[in-house]
Amino acid sequence: MDQTSIQTSDGEAATANTLKYMPGFGNDFETESLPGALPQGQNSPQKCNYGLYAEQLSGSPFTAPRGTNERSWLYRIRPSVRHTRRFSNASYPLWKTAPCLDEHSLPLGQLRWDPIPAPAERLTFLEGVRTITTAGDAATQVGMSAHAYVFNEDMVDDYFFNADGELLIVPQLGAIRVFTEMGIMDVEPLEICLIPRGMMFKILKSGEQTVWRGYICENYGAKFTLPDRGPIGANCLANPRDFKTPVAAFEDKETPCRVHVKWCGKFYVTEIGHSPLDVVAWHGNYAPFKYDLRTFSPVGAIRFDHPDPSIFSVLTAPSEDAGTANVDFVIFPPRWLVAEHTFRPPWYHRNIMSEFMGLIHGQYDAKEEGFVPGGISLHNMMLPHGPDALAFEKASNTELKPVKLDHTMAFMFETRYAQQLTKYAAELETLQDNYLECWDGLERKFDGTPGIK
């Protein structure tokens, strides 16, 4: 990519050292990459400075309540109507959309996979998305899909926007550069980023490894927001100041480019003669952001018992039923375990919610073996799950002194809807055939006599 064609708010080429961000969650931001490009006192002047075009990008209906009303005003080199021409059909057969009831022979059950294989061919991020599960219905804007991605090639002249939902990207191996209409974000493992529905972007490699891998939650429903803290109060969990939105940056490039679109589960492509990432200035609250998971401030039991995992929610996308999420993004970060007379790992559970889990690095305390970084587990609604036999015996017999659970970061996409497995996931070579055996060592201890066994 020609770095000299990219200009940031400092008028410099966009390098890792020059990228800047604006702190806050849901703020009404303003930023310009050329002085005076942002109109003051109005949104739509008769003529914009620098010959720019004013355009509004709406993330909510005009009449949504003020607290959930989202829109941004963009001041760009060309209006978006010039960024699409006649569309033709495109195909990304491994990226599926709900409802998706693929036919496969894998029966219902608790499932776990090792990391998806590195590609033998050259793949961009867009070409490297592999859907594992789908839930709900994208056309009616409910539910989500869980994907893995693996790629090794930059999206140089290829751009993409997703009309079906917002994308929460969780890198696991390799940092990525996410160049959106509204600015540039460098995102490394242990960070996440969110790209709003309908926003144009491309993704580039960062670093020197041979493969880049991670996870994606495609949220079809109401957008992700911060969960209510309730009696926790005004602090802890994910604090708003730790979310970072990029400053304005634009790519001024007059070369053949392709714009790819996902709309109602189908893919289309159109060819244009310039970069669509041409927003010189913008203001508003509909914007991408990134977040460092290491800044999450966990709370937990400081005397006894194991609290519900909802205390580890970073973001939640609500449904129409209060307290029932369309999808939650939950992490299991480093933390101190201090509970007395308590089985400290997550307890055995059957749940109305369906849980897709991934591991960014380290070990997960309920599954010290078999669940590896880059791996995936799926525990669908009402299917039992919990610590394996090794973790149970260890936690049941260990000395209960304060212990720091360190060097770990697991996460969960949890939804109220059943997660339907794709044919790709059902037939993936990394599926662990012996996963259920992890509980085989949990033998009967009950013999009818009182006392600790």
Curated annotation (Swiss-Prot):
Domain of life according to the entry: Bacteria
Record GO terms (molecular function): homogentisate 1,2-dioxygenase activity; iron ion binding
EC number: 1.13.11.5
Matching CDD domains: cupin_HGO_N
Cellular component, GO annotation: cytoplasm
Binding site for Fe cation: 349, 355, 385
Catalyzed chemical reaction(s): homogentisate + O2 = 4-maleylacetoacetate + H(+)
Keyword line: Dioxygenase, Iron, Metal-binding, Oxidoreductase, Phenylalanine catabolism, Tyrosine catabolism
Function in brief: Involved in the catabolism of homogentisate (2,5-dihydroxyphenylacetate or 2,5-OH-PhAc), a central intermediate in the degradation of phenylalanine and tyrosine. Catalyzes the oxidative ring cleavage of the aromatic ring of homogentisate to yield maleylacetoacetate.
Family per record: Belongs to the homogentisate dioxygenase family.
HAMAP family: Homogentis_dioxygen
Stated name of the protein: Homogentisate 1,2-dioxygenase
